[in-house]
Each structure stands twice: as structure tokens, then as C-alpha cells.
From Swiss-Prot:
UniProt entry keywords in alphabetical sequence: Ribonucleoprotein, Ribosomal protein, RNA-binding, rRNA-binding
Taxonomic superkingdom: Bacteria
One Pfam assignment: Ribosomal_L10
Name of the featured protein: Large ribosomal subunit protein uL10
Length: 173
């Protein structure tokens, strides 16, 4: 059933609000995907904080008009699903991971930081760890020396308590 003009304006406003907050948009062709698979994709996207939507391309073009993603309008042809995310890699990661397991989803293009990305660039973006993963790695690197030092102090304390108390009180040279 076609949308009336008010519904179209509402859709454009909703998508424009998402685009205004977004860092990345990824576009993929979805011909022939089963409803169950598409439902799984939407659930995964929701968990990752990705706004996933099937839109008429004309409405999508209007939503990105005047934004850093306007260059993506040329790629908006055919049956497309749009992944929009505030996290720079989340939408690329969700759609790329799904495309690996479902050959009917074909990545077409993306846009990040005002630049239009081709398929290989979207895949490269998807391979970058997310912000949360990077923070976890950084904390792990920062925590390792502290943990090692704490274990060393614990081992020294245990050795001192086992050793003769006279050695501990010996004058330093």
C-alpha cells in the first residue's frame, strides 16, 4: 500500500533524525532474503545499536540531502536496506557479518566521515574493532603491568614471611 504524503514526511523526518546522529551509513541490496533471516538481521542490528530500515530510495535521498552522507545518493538504486549507526563501525560490521552467512545480502556502498565508501572499504571498516573493544584492549594493556607488579609484591611478601626474620632486619649497605 503506498504511503500518503504525510506518512512520507514522517518517514523522512524519522530517518533524517537518525542520519543527523550517525557516523556511518551502509547500504546493501537484499533481494530474495527470507523473512526469518531478515528478522534475525534486525535483532542483531538492534543489539548493536544500528538503525536498520528498508526504505524507498527517493525517501532515503531526501533524508540524506544536505548532510555529509549526500554523496551516497548516487548509490541508492534497487531494493536496498540501510544501516545507520552512531558507532563508526557497527553498521558495517552487522551487515558485513550477515552478508558472510547469507549470499542474498550484497553490500553496495557506505559513507563515513563525509566520504563515500566502496564495498572493499566497507569490509575494511567492518574489520576494525568497535569502540568498546578498543577500550577493553587498552584497559587490558594498561592493567597488565600493574597486575604483574602486584603479583611480584605478593610473591616477595610470601618469600619474606617464609624466610628468616633476621635477614629482614639486616642493615642495608
Amino acid at each position: 500500500m503506498p504511503l500518503n504524503i504525510e506518512d512520507k514526511k514522517a518517514v523522512v523526518a524519522e530517518v533524517s533524525a537518525q542520519v543527523a546522529k550517525a557516523q556511518t551509513i551502509v547500504v546493501a541490496e537484499y533481494r530474495g532474503i527470507a523473512v526469518g533471516d531478515l528478522t534475525k538481521l534486525r535483532a542483531t542490528a538492534r543489539q548493536q545499536g544500528v538503525y536498520l530500515r528498508v526504505l524507498k530510495n527517493t525517501l532515503a535521498r531526501r533524508a540524506v540531502e544536505g548532510t555529509p552522507f549526500a554523496g551516497l545518493a548516487e548509490q541508492m538504486t534497487g531494493p536496498l536496506i540501510y544501516g545507520i549507526s552512531e558507532d563508526a563501525v557497527a553498521s558495517a560490521k552487522v551487515l558485513n557479518d550477515f552478508a558472510k552467512t547469507n549470499d542474498k545480502l550484497v553490500l553496495r556502498a557506505g559513507s563515513y566521515d563525509g566520504k563515500v565508501l566502496d564495498v572493499n572499504a566497507v569490509k575494511a571498516l567492518a574489520s576494525i574493532p568497535s569502540r568498546d573493544e578498543l577500550i577493553a584492549q587498552l584497559l587490558g594493556v594498561m592493567q597488565a603491568p600493574v597486575s604483574g607488579f602486584a603479583r611480584l609484591l605478593g610473591a616477595l611478601a610470601a618469600k619474606k614471611s617464609e624466610g628468616a626474620p633476621a635477614e629482614a632486619e639486616a642493615p642495608a649497605a
